[in-house]
Amino acid sequence: MKTIIAEKPSVAREIARIVGATKREEGYFEGGGYAVTWAFGHLVQLAMPDGYGIRGFVRDNLPVIPDTFTLVPRQVKTEKGYKPDSGVVTQIKTVTRLFKESEQIIVATDAGREGELIFRYLYHYTGCATPFVRLWISSLTDKAIREGLRNLEAGGKYDDLYLAAKARSESDWLVGINGTQALSIAAGHGTYSVGRVQTPTLAMVCARYWENRRFTPEAFWQLHIATDGCDEGTVKFSSSEKWKEKEPATELYNKVKSAGTATVTKAERKEKTEETPLLYDLTTLQKEANAKHGFTAEQTLEIAQKLYEKKLITYPRTGSRYIPEDVFTEIPKLLAFIGNLPEWKDKVNPKAVPTRRSVDGGKVTDHHALLVTGEKPLFLSKEDNTVYQMIAGRMIEAFSEKCVKDTATVTAECAGAEFVVKGSVIRQVGWRAVYGEEEKEETIIPGWQEDDRLALKAASITEGKTKPKPLHTEASLLSAMETAGKEIEDDALRQALKDCGIGTPATRAAIIETLFKRGYMERCKKSLVPTEKGLALYSVVKTMLIADVAMTGEWEKELARIERGELPADTFRKEIEAYTREITSELLSCDKLFARKDSGCKCPKCGTGSMQFYGKVVRCDNAECGLPVFRLKANRTLTDDEIKDLLTDGHTKLLKGFKSKQGKSFDAVVAFDGDYNTTFVFPERKTTKKFSGRKK
C-alpha cells in the first residue's frame, strides 16, 4: 500500500477520486492500493518553553535557546494553559499507522515552503522511516494531478526547502518567545507581543504615521498661462518654479499678464513605450485587490486559495511574476478560453501572437505566476469572481502588445519665467485596451517649434500646499514589506529585491492580520493607523534591532540562500541565536522605560487593583484585570493630573491641543465608556453625554 498525504481534506478527496481510493475511513480514504489521508494545516508544532521544563516569563530563564527543538501535537489554549488538540491527536494516530503500514509515502501537501514543513514535522514526530516521494504540482486540475502522479519527484530533492522552512520556524520561535517575554517582563504588567517580522512591519506603519502627522504643510504659489491649441482647444502651461512667498509670485504674475506673449524655448517630441504589465504573483494581486476593490490582503489570499482548490487558478502562494517556456506553449489556448468568457468578449484577438515579457524560466522559483487553468468559473460569489477576473484580465494584458505614445514637452519663456506643458497621444493602444484605459490624454500639443511666439489667452496664479506622504494602506505596506522599506516603482527592480523583503508572499497577509489581532493597529477606511498600544510599543523599540527592517530583510535573504542550497542551515541557526541573545538583552533593559509609580487611584474597572503610572501607559496592578489607559490621545499626552481626573471622576476636564487624523486641532473631554475604553466627548455634546466612568 502507498499512502498519499494532502494538506487539507478537500484536496485529499480530489486525489482519492483520481487514484480510486473511494472507501471512506476515519481520517482517510482507501482503495486501489492507496490510502489518502490529510493534515489540516500544521498537526505538529514546536513546543513552548514549558515543554523543555522552563517556566515562562522569568527574567533569569531568558533567553530560552533549546539545543534541539521538541515537536508536539498542535496545542489549544484552555483556562488551565495549553493542551494538545484532541482532534489533532486522533488524526496523528491515524497518519502514524498509515505511514508505518505503507511501502511508500507520496507527499501531496502544498508545493511550497510551509507545505513541505507540515509534512516533514509530522514525519519526524511520528518517527517514520518509510521512504517518501514528492507530488509537486501548480494546479489541482485532474490533468495536473494525473501528470504529477506519473512524474513523482525524489523526496530528497526538497531537503533544502525543508531546511529553510525549519530555520524560519525556529527563528520565529526564538525571536518571538524571547522577545515577547523580555519586553513583557520589562513592562511589569501585560503582554507585549513582538516578532522577527511583525515588529519591523509595525515599525514601518508607525514611522509613516508620525511622518504624516508631524508634517507641516507649506504654502507655495505657481503661475499658469494659456494659449490656443488644436481644434479650438486651449493649452495650459505651468511655471517650472513654485514660490514659497506670495509677493514675488504676484509681482511676476503681473508682468506675465502685461507681456501678452510667450516664446517657445524648447520643443521635444519622443516616442514612449509602456511595457505590458507582468503577470500577478500573490503580493501584486493583493496590492491591486486592495487598491481597486478594498480587499484586505488576508481576504485576497483566502479567495485565491478557494479558487485554487476549485481548480480555477494555479498555485496562489507564488512569489514569481514569470512563466517558463513549457507553460508559455499553453497560453494561446488559455487566452482563447478567457476570450470566450462574457467579461472578456472582444478583448482577446484570436490571431494575435502572445508577447513574451512574462516568459523567463530563470525567474521562476517554486511556482510560476498566477494563471487561470481553463476550468469554467461557475457559481462564484461576487468577491471570488472579482479576483478570478483580475487574474484573467492580467493575463490578457501581459500577453498583449506594448502601448506606444507620442509625447511632447514644450518649454516657453514669458516675462523671465519658464513655463512647461506636457502632452501625449496614443499611437498603439496595446495592452491598455483591455480595461479601456486608453487614458484621457493630458493635452494634444500643436506642432510648435523653438522661437515660436504664442499669444496668451489668460494668465493665473494659484496657491497650493505641500502634502505629506499618505498613511500606509495594505497595498503600500505590502510594497514596503516586499522591498524592506525601499520605495521602488519599477516592476523588474522589485523582482530583483524580493529575496531582501520581509516576510514571504505566503506569510505577509498573516503578519498584517497579527498586528490587528494584537491591537497594534486598526483600519481607518483604507488607511492603516497604529493604535495607542502600537505607538507605545514603537516608542520603546524603534531604535532597537527587533524593529530593524533592513536586518529582517537580510534574514529573509539568508533563508532564501538556504532554500537554494547556498548557506548551511547551522550557520543561520548560530547567527539567529546570537541575534536572539542581543535583542533579549536589549528588551530586558527597557525596564527603566517602564519604571512605575503608584497613582494613588483605585482601578475604576475592578475596584481592587491600584493604577500604576508607567512611561507610556497607566495600568491596573491586579493581574486578573490589568486595565490599561494609554497616555497618548490624538497626538497629545495626558499629564498625571489629567489621568487622575479620568480615573477618579470617569472623565477629564475640557482639554485643548488634540489633533485629528486629518491634522485638525480640537478640544475635548476624555472619558471612559461602558467598557472602560477611553473616548472623546466634545464640548457641544457635553451637556447631553452621560459619562460611563464611575467614581470609586
Spans of features found by a protein language model:
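Basic, low-complexity terminal or inter-domain segments flanking catalytic cores
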Residues: 2, 81-83, 125, 180, ...
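Short glycine-centered, acidic/aromatic-flanked micro-motifs in structured strand/loop junctions
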Residues: 109, 287, 317
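Metal- or metallocofactor-binding catalytic centers and their adjacent structured scaffolds
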Residues: 244-280, 286
